């Protein structure tokens, strides 16, 4: 791509989060979801205004819904659907139907990374004219293991070009 074509490059941001715990036997499902938007600042601003208006600053947990949380969820969905650049998709794993031993040698970090890569690739599409940034909820990853660099490397190697420029995990309670 020529330098004068830089305005054609899309710079979407992916917000990745999970629900459920892979290694918890009594938790039958594990899900990864991603919101992709080319205008993250607008969506974040709407959510911040909503949180300030309702004085609600805690993390939303689906298993702890209350009347106030229903209202913030409703208005949050409204803000999301008004953002024409925002897209949501997810992958839901029914853990008892998957053979983690055969496919992943029971390496649950590999399971998480593999499904993260799959979800991101499905949302990148052909990768043409896109350079993405991924922000993920802080998922336990032991020292010496690097989810961010591994995921970015796998995706960029797949496309044979830079499609993911950055991947950062943050604690969702701090943002």
Residue ranges, per PLM feature:
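Phosphate-ester processing/binding pockets and catalytic centers
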Residues: 1-175
């Amino acid at each position: 791509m020529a330098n004068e074509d830089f305005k054609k490059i899309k710079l979407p941001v992916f917000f990745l989060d999970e629900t459920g715990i892979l290694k918890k036997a009594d938790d039958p499902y594990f899900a990864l979801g991603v919101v992709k938007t080319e205008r993250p600042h607008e969506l974040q601003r709407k959510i911040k205004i909503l949180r300030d208006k309702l004085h609600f600053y805690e993390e939303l947990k689906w298993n702890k819904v209350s009347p106030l949380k229903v209202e913030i969820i409703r208005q949050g969905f409204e803000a999301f659907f008004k953002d024409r650049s925002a897209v949501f998709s997810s992958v839901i794993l029914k853990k008892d139907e998957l053979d983690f031993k055969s496919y992943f040698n029971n390496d649950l970090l590999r399971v998480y990374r593999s499904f993260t890569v799959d979800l991101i690739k499905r949302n990148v599409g052909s990768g043409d004219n896109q350079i993405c940034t991924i922000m993920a909820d802080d998922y336990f990853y032991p020292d010496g293991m690097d989810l961010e660099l591994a995921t970015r490397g796998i995706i960029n190697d797949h496309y044979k070009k830079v499609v993911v420029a950055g991947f950062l995990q943050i604690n969702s309670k701090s943002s």
